[in-house]
Amino acid sequence: MKLKHFLIKRINIWENAELIESNTIEFDKTFRVYFENLQEAREINMILPIFSKMYIDIILESLIENDATLTLITNKRILDLINENDADNAFDSLIKEGRIQAILADYDLEMFFTSCDNFSSLFLFFDKMLFDDSEMLLIKDEENIKNAKNMFNHLERLAKSQFPLKH
């Protein structure tokens, strides 16, 4: 099942989400809001369809500072880029400590979805392959955070059934 189809069936969890938009004055607003929320998370679940050193750095920083855990669904290309750019071996060390569980998906990841204990967020792509970080849907209410976690758990089972990553 494609991720888009799965998401459409569960779109109601996003109906009360706040739309965070960057603009010419606050060009980094979505990144800043994402980072502020991620800094408070202790349990992070993520579908990561892109490689961005900036995002990887804030994810690793949050994991280290909060003694947090990460379940990461990504593809081989992104995982290879993360490992190639892991100069201080933080990513590899966190995997060895059991604080990062990486799952490789063999299908297109068409969204950047984060489900944490304190928030959930969704970034989409513009025109199929262009990642749009100027807009983000943000969930902060407890009930929809729980629903987003359930959605992530389903997507995790789907990814594991297709191509689990073993370390």
What are the language-model segments listed below?
Residues 1-11, 55-167:
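PLD/PLD-like phosphodiesterase catalytic module centered on the HKD motif
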Residues 1-72:
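PLD-like (HKD) phosphodiesterase/transphosphatidyltransferase domain
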